[in-house]
Design a protein with these regions (language model features):
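Zn-dependent metallopeptidase/amidohydrolase metal-coordination segment
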Residues: 68-70, 74-81, 88, 140-203
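Short, solvent-exposed polar/charged micro-motifs at secondary-structure junctions
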Residues: 33-39, 125-130, 158-163
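Generic non-transmembrane alpha-helical segments
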Residues: 3-14, 103-111, 131, 135-143, ...
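Conserved beta-strand segments of alpha/beta enzyme cores
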Residues: 23-25, 114, 149, 170
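His/Asp/Glu-rich mid-to-C-terminal helical/loop segments that flank catalytic regions of hydrolases
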Residues: 1, 40-50, 58, 98-101, ...
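Substrate-recognition/cap regions that form aromatic- and gly/pro-loop-enriched pockets
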Residues: 66-155
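Short, low-complexity, polar/charged sequence segments that are solvent-exposed and flexible
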Residues: 6-10, 45-46, 92-95, 104-110, ...
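Midchain, well-structured core segments that form catalytic/ion-binding scaffolds
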Residues: 1-90
């Protein structure tokens, strides 16, 4: 327990800036039975978690501070005879995403495991020149007398799927303000919903 508590203190100090409220608790439950690994299997699992990359892989060359390619270990499950790790791979570059996917797969096989791909969606690559983005920005500025906030983000968005269906498809993603998205406290701002409606109808009139 002392070793675990010392390790917890080291981790809390290491992540004090990015995760200031990090809490690690170790409880001694007494004797009991649970799944455990022998020394060789334990070392193999440590190698798996250390050798397969995790986190930011590459930053964008076009936009300062934007992550371009990453992967994250989201779920790790230890069963009676198996260990399964689920990674989410994201990239705004299709070639980088495919390379990283292949790299993780090859490393998994090298370590004696197998892998499968699920929920694969194409990358939505950044365009320096976008006519629809410029049109939306101009319409927003004119309708609401303020500059449109145009941002890029490192996330999985359906536009990547749609853009891959037609060559040279120009896409943007926009919508009303949503607070606490993807949580039970999710809320939609009604006033921004009205602005979104006015914006999209104005742009559609220009495209008609």
């Amino acid at each position: 327990a002392e070793l675990l508590n010392n390790t917890a203190d080291v981790l809390k100090e290491e992540y004090s800036v990015t995760d200031p409220h990090l809490t690690i608790k170790v409880n001694c439950e007494g004797e009991g039975s649970t799944l455990a690994c022998d020394d060789a299997t334990t070392q193999m699992l440590i190698n798996v978690l250390n050798f397969i990359p995790d986190g930011v892989v590459k930053m964008s060359n076009d936009i300062k501070g934007l992550v371009q390619t990453s992967l994250n270990l989201g779920v790790a499950e230890l069963a009676e005879k198996t260990f399964a790790a689920t990674y989410l791979i994201r990239s705004s570059s299709q070639s980088e995403k495919e390379y990283l996917t292949d790299k993780v797969g090859k490393m998994t096989e090298y370590l004696g495991g197998t892998y499968e791909l699920k929920g694969v969606y194409p990358a939505w690559e950044f365009k320096k020149n976008s006519a629809i983005r410029d049109m939306l920005s101009e319409s927003y500025n004119r309708l609401f007398n303020k500059e449109a906030l145009v941002e890029t983000m490192h996330a999985g968005v359906e536009c990547g799927i749609m853009a891959a269906k037609i060559d040279d498809r120009d896409c943007v993603s926009f919508g009303p303000d949503i607070i606490d998205i993807h949580t039970v406290k999710e809320k939609l701002d009604i006033a921004s919903t009205q602005r979104t409606w006015e914006l999209i109808t104005d742009v559609l009139k220009q495209l008609a």
